[in-house]
């Protein structure tokens, strides 16, 4: 007990009914899984309290009133177990009942404890029967007879059980026989605790007058030698005792009058005394962390003691689930003036009149070939148009068949854009349930006819972009987009993400100290985290694929998309699989070179014997492998079904214990000879990744056999030999308990789809998503991942390969024991040092625009930060202009992150930047868009830049750390910024002022420039006299932060609707742009009034009017602002990513209605 320990909280025990009086707690206990304190009362009700403030969390009637009081509470990972005299009950921590057990021989239960098996407990009491209960099944599995009445149980080296006569029995944990018994106290034992090898008891004895009184000694026993140790003197009367969970020889001893003593059992003279403010103590308990102590008294109160600076109940607690806030339905403004298009129209499902049949559509000529985007950076102006070096991708006099390009893709019925839905319903209406992509595609055929076609979901899918960007789509599952170079790896990335052990490895590595710019394992961690946070929105693997493209080895091996013209997709993805696994291993060892965690998970540990067939000389070298290729025997298809050598398990065994013959150099013969190479396996990995390696049509016949690919295989390694089993043979070996047998289950596979009907080959993945689910699922659920189209499929369909257009490429098996092994502990070990130190590529030049965070400012969940980013153009958008003049975005513009500014959103330094990084870009920059981004040539070059220049990996990791620390990002138009950064932020961590200041009756988003003027009468983002200046991201982020604070003031005052009405009324007059500085302008004051601004002062911010007088202000004299399109806000009408509201107050400015 440290010097600053004191009473932190005191709460009354909740009454048994809403109008009842508080009652005494019959038992209290700290939860060893979550930050909860549990208490039970005499009416059979158990209640939990959250955190140091002891907030009410759950309250459940666990036992009928007739069963008596709650006498003990135990904790399991799956729930909470309570005991009353006549029943045992288990609930989840949210209060849902798991099971309830009562028995005719359960008459006076007092205690319970875990046994040697962690899924079983034993319950006992003042009765002649003890019961063993299986927690998982909720049933009694055994009944034991006993000659003792037990009142208390504690588990340590033995099961220590106190009797009602003052004795303590040490019971065996396996058969519960009495190993040793001590007469500890004369009358009864009041409390005891056992931990490690020590047992301490407190109790009563009879003195002179014949009535029992509390013993002034706490008895101590050594469970290792089963002998008593010197007792602990405690003159106030030792009534209660608890052993410290961390300090093995330290115990807390308490009296009934509230005196607390912390004593070392090995040194009784070293004591620490405290006095609790209680009239009569009924019990104590100490938290698993040792940092909190709970006291239960006779005045119906619970006291919490601890250190105010560092109290917590557990070292590693699971997050406590709280109830969702139920949104209130928005009021419907129904009046004669309400336009009917506010009500919305239903979605169509039948065929539209505009869908003309194919026999009425005729070709009228081929469109010109589109310009290769790779030529754009090299274009040079000429007298007419531009010119560039010829890339020589076609032969001489060869032209491109552009008609084939337009008709190669099937006519797929795409789902509705969200922007189309926005015309039918307002933002504040709850989004109606719409069919997912698979349902939207169902019923269409490749030729456009409305008939069912099972091949449609396997077809090539291409995103049709709207002018609002890709966030304008509405899909029910998170897929990966296809418009990025090397996106043919999407199927493999999805497969790796759904392997729990690979997913855990990547996320833990991403949370480490790694800041290597080309770390593929980090990028996988970022992508997997993004896919989990997306909740059905599309994601893109831009950063990962950019890193993959930067590897010279990948280019030399022909693994990039530009090199696949002469290589099949199947062989290419298998080569990429080997490259990914090797690079993952390399990246992992760069941070933890001495750890074998990756080898344990992914690597087949083996030795390779090479023997010369001429001289029989043999050498042995390591032969570890990360990916195994299947080797097929010479196949007689007639015997394939009956011959065991053609079973998958046999082929797998031969592939792992690969034995080959070829020519090699013999050091003994000093010449090339015929050598035999054979592998001896020492250990199999937890994750087994296989390349199918289908080299000919004969091997493919095996796969076409129904049920040939098993869902489960068993592998046993014995003295370097591998044994593989499947089907009934595997079940037999499991029943016989074959040593070292490990069962693997199929997580998923990557397949090549080659439908010959005017389609190009592409890759899909079939994944059993139940394996990676956090909650146990009895049924396997298989899904087809076809880039951004995700569809649930039947298991037989996923594992059937008797179609000529479907070929297996990569298989992934994982040990069955790792099912649902989704580990989120990486969030608790995030390495945040990058946020607290400077990092620069250009020699650490002084940065005056920011002030680095201190340790005292470490972000916590809910910490607001203001964000703004700037981008440069790497590629222009590809737009197809149709014959009727309409435009369709074929491929969006490609932007590169150039600057990131993050400001503190609260505290003493509110509004002060702590991140202001410029990002170096190695790709050719088409346009710096200086007028809008403020980025000038040379700003991103380490040799000439005067700013803090960092790699993209460092800037991205800072934002990723803030995201996973729980920060709330405040900004304007964040949806566009997040997409270009390639990061997924949940709605609960986003405050977008573009959606805060949105009127439900106006289909318009307001620019930050206009909002700054409308709310604060300030001019930002003005047209500079020098076009080489442009925007300032710090200014934009600070303005967004101030707008949020001001909006909170409007909410507190209840005038949000009036303010929005006034803002939109004035905006419609001014074209939603700030008025020119010269001239008279009418600005907002309060609802229903106006203020006239005169030109006089020349300041950015107009003068603040007096609070009590007429609201007047002055504006500056300047050149009028030229209307222009905000480049960085080009998707101002993108669907909302959500809003965040919370307590806070901003400054009061002139014209505020709060005045």
From Swiss-Prot:
Entry GO CC: P-body; PAN complex
CDD domains to which the protein is assigned, alphabetical: PAN2_exo
Record GO biological process: mRNA processing; nuclear-transcribed mRNA poly(A) tail shortening
Main location as per UniProt: cytoplasm
Binding site for a divalent metal cation: 868, 870, 977, 1036
Co-factor remark: Binds 2 metal cations per subunit in the catalytic exonuclease domain.
PROSITE patterns in UniProt: USP_3 (PS50235)
Subcellular compartments: Cytoplasm
Positions of the UniProt region annotated as Linker: 316-452
Domain USP: start-end pairs: 453-816
WD repeats: 20-59, 102-145, 276-315
Sequence segments annotated as region (Disordered): 1086-1155
GO molecular function, a single term: poly(A)-specific ribonuclease activity
Keyword tags: Cytoplasm, Exonuclease, Hydrolase, Metal-binding, mRNA processing, Nuclease, Repeat, WD repeat
Pfam families: PAN2_N, RNase_T, UCH_1
Regulation (activators, inhibitors): Positively regulated by the regulatory subunit pan3.
The keyword Nuclease is annotated on this UniProt entry: yes
UniProt remark on domains: Contains a pseudo-UCH domain. This ubiquitin C-terminal hydrolase (UCH)-like or ubiquitin specific protease (USP)-like domain is predicted to be catalytically inactive because it lacks the active site catalytic triad characteristic of thiol proteases, with residues at the equivalent structural positions that are incompatible with catalysis, and it cannot bind ubiquitin. It functions as a structural scaffold for intra- and intermolecular interactions in the complex. The linker, or PAN3 interaction domain (PID), between the WD40 repeats and the pseudo-UCH domain mediates interaction with pan3.
Family: Belongs to the peptidase C19 family. PAN2 subfamily.
Subunit structure: Forms a heterotrimer with an asymmetric homodimer of the regulatory subunit pan3 to form the poly(A)-nuclease (PAN) deadenylation complex.
Protein's name in the database: PAN2-PAN3 deadenylation complex catalytic subunit pan2
Gene giving rise to this polypeptide: pan2n2
């Amino acid at each position: 007990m440290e010097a600053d320990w004191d009473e932190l909280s005191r709460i009354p025990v909740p009454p048994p009914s809403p109008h009842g009086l508080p009652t005494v707690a019959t038992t209290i206990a700290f939860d060893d899984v979550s930050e909860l304190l549990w208490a039970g009362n005499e009416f059979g009700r158990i209640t939990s309290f959250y955190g140091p403030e002891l907030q009410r969390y759950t309250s459940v009637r666990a036992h009928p009133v007739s069963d008596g009081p709650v006498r003990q509470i135990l904790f399991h990972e799956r729930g909470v177990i309570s005991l009353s005299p006549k029943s045992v009950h288990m609930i989840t921590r949210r209060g849902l009942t798991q099971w309830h057990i009562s028995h005719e021989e359960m008459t006076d239960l007092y205690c319970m404890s875990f046994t040697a098996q962690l899924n079983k407990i034993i319950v006992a009491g003042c009765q002649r029967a003890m019961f063993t209960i299986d927690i998982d099944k909720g049933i009694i599995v055994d009944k034991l007879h006993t000659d003792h009445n037990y009142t208390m149980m504690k588990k340590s080296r033995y099961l220590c059980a106190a009797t009602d006569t003052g004795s303590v029995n040490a019971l065996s944990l396996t058969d519960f026989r009495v190993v040793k018994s001590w007469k500890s106290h004369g009358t009864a034992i009041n409390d005891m605790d056992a931990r490690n090898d020590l047992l301490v008891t407190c109790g009563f004895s009879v003195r002179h007058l014949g009535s029992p009184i509390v013993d002034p000694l706490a008895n101590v026993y050594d469970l290792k030698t089963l002998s008593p140790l010197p007792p602990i003197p405690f003159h106030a009367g030792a009534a209660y005792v608890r052993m410290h969970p961390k300090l093995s020889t330290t115990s807390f001893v308490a009296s009934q009058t509230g005196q607390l003593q912390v004593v070392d059992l090995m040194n009784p003279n070293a004591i620490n005394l405290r006095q609790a403010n209680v009239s009569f103590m009924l019990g104590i308990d100490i938290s698993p962390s040792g940092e909190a102590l709970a006291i239960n008294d006779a005045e119906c109160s619970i006291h919490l003691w601890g250190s105010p600076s560092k109290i917590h109940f557990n070292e590693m607690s699971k997050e406590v689930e709280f109830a969702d806030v139920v949104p209130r339905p928005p009021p419907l403004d129904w009046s004669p003036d309400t336009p009917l298009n506010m009500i919305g129209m239903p979605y169509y499902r039948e065929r539209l009149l505009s869908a003309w049949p194919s026999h009425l559509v005729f070709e009228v000529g081929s469109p010109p070939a589109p310009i290769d985007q790779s030529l754009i950076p090299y274009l040079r102006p000429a007298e007419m148009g531009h010119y560039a070096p010829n890339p020589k991708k076609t032969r001489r006099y060869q032209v491109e068949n552009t008609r084939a390009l337009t008709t190669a893709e099937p006519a797929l019925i795409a789902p509705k854009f969200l922007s189309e839905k926005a015309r039918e319903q307002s933002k504040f209406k709850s989004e109606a349930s719409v069919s997912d992509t698979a349902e939207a595609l169902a019923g269409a055929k490749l030729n456009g006819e409305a008939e069912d076609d099972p091949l449609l979901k396997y077809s090539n899918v291409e995103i049709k972009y709207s002018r609002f960007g890709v966030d304008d789509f509405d899909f029910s599952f998170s897929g990966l987009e296809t418009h990025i170079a090397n996106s043919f790896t999407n199927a493999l990335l999805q497969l790796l993400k759904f392997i729990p052990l690979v997913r855990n490895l990547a996320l833990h590595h991403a949370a480490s100290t790694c800041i290597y710019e080309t770390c593929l394992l980090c990028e996988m961690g970022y992508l997997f985290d993004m896919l989990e946070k997306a909740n059905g929105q599309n994601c893109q693997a831009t950063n990962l694929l950019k890193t993959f493209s930067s590897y010279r080895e990948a280019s030399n091996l022909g693994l990039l998309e530009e090199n696949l013209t002469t290589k099949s997709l199947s062989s290419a993805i298998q080569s990429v699989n080997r490259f990914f696994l090797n690079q993952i291993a390399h990246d992992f060892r760069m941070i933890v070179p001495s750890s074998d965690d990756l080898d344990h998970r992914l690597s087949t540990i083996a030795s390779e014997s090479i023997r010369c067939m001429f001289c029989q000389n043999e050498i042995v070298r390591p032969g570890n492998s990360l990916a195994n290729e299947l080797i097929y025997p010479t196949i007689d298809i007639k015997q394939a079904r009956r011959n065991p050598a053609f079973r998958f398990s046999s082929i797998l065994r031969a592939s792992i214990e690969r034995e080959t013959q070829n020519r090699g150099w013999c050091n003994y013969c000093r010449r090339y000879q015929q050598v035999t190479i054979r592998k001896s396996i020492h250990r199999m990995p937890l994750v087994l990744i296989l390349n199918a390696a289908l080299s000919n049509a004969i091997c493919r016949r095996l796969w076409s056999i129904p049920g040939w690919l098993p869902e489960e295989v068993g592998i046993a390694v014995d003295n370097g030999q591998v044994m593989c089993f499947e089907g009934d043979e595997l079940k037999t070996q499991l029943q016989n308990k074959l040593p070292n047998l490990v069962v693997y289950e199929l997580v998923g596979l990557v397949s090549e789809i080659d439908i010959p009907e005017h389609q190009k080959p592409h890759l899909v993945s079939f994944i059993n998503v139940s394996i990676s689910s956090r909650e146990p699922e009895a049924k396997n659920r298989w899904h087809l991942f076809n880039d951004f189209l995700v569809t649930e499929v039947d298991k037989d369909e996923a594992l059937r390969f008797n179609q000529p257009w479907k070929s297996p490429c990569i298989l992934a098996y994982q040990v069955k024991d790792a099912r649902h092994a989704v580990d989120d502990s990486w969030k608790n070990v995030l390495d945040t040092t990058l946020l607290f130190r400077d990092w620069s590529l250009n020699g650490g030049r002084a940065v005056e625009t920011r002030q680095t965070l201190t340790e005292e400012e470490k972000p916590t969940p809910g910490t607001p930060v203001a964000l703004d980013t700037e981008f440069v153009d790497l590629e222009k958008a590809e737009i197809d202009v149709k014959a009727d003049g309409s435009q369709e975005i074929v491929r969006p513009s490609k932007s590169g992150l150039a600057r990131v500014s993050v400001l503190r959103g609260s505290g003493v330094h509110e509004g002060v930047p702590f991140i202001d990084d410029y990002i170096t870009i190695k790709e050719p920059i088409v346009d710096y868009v200086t007028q809008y981004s403020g980025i000038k040539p040379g700003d991103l070059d380490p040799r000439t830049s005067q700013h803090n220049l960092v790699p993209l990996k460092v800037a991205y990791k800072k934002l990723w750390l803030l995201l996973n620390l729980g920060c709330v990002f405040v900004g304007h138009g964040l949806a566009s910024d997040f997409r270009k950064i390639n990061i997924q932020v949940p709605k609960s961590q986003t405050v977008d002022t573009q959606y805060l200041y949105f009127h439900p009756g106006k289909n318009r988003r307001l620019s930050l420039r206009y909002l700054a003027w409308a709310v604060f009468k300030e001019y930002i983002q003005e047209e500079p006299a020098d076009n080489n200046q442009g925007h300032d991201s710090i200014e934009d982020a600070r303005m967004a932060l101030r707008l949020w604070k001001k909006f909170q003031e409007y909410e507190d005052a209840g005038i949000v609707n009036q303010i929005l009405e006034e803002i939109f009324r004035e905006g419609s007059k001014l074209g939603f742009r700030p008025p020119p500085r010269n001239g008279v302008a009418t600005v907002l004051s309060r609802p229903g009034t106006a203020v006239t601004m005169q030109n006089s002062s020349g300041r950015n911010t107009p003068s603040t009017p007096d609070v009590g007088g007429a609201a007047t202000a002055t504006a500056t004299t300047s050149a009028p602002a030229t209307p222009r399109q905000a480049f960085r806000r080009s998707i101002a009408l993108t669907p909302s990513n959500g809003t965040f509201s919370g307590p806070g107050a901003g400054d009061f400015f002139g014209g505020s209605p709060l005045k």
